[in-house]
Amino acid sequence: MIYENNNFTLSQDRELPIVGFFVISPKKHIEKLNELSEQERNEMFSIINTVIKIEKDNNICKDFNVVFEEKDKRHFHVRIMPRHERMSKICNNITQNIGLIFDYAKKNFRTENIYNKINEAVKITREQFRS
């Protein structure tokens, strides 16, 4: 857990070893974005903006895709997906091929070096959320 408040959690999915990849999940079960109140949506977007600012300010990544995951009978969540240069070599459109990126990361990014970079990104993000 990187950050937590009354409504949301921010975490890094260790199964997807991508530096700067974070997931925001509401604590209450919802399936769709429109099930959040206006206050909750504003809070969620504030978390998104803070994560992206932290990552840019600390040279973790400079470009991102923000993916809203809505599926029937599933829990809504937001993925902050960094667009590292090396990812463009895997595919041209990250949002259309997110599964391809995830599969590639699971097979090729599970290295000590990558996990060290992920841990550093998590540490930086956690510390800056606390300050």
Q: Can you annotate each of these PLM segments?
A:
Residues 1-131:
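HIT superfamily nucleotide-processing domains
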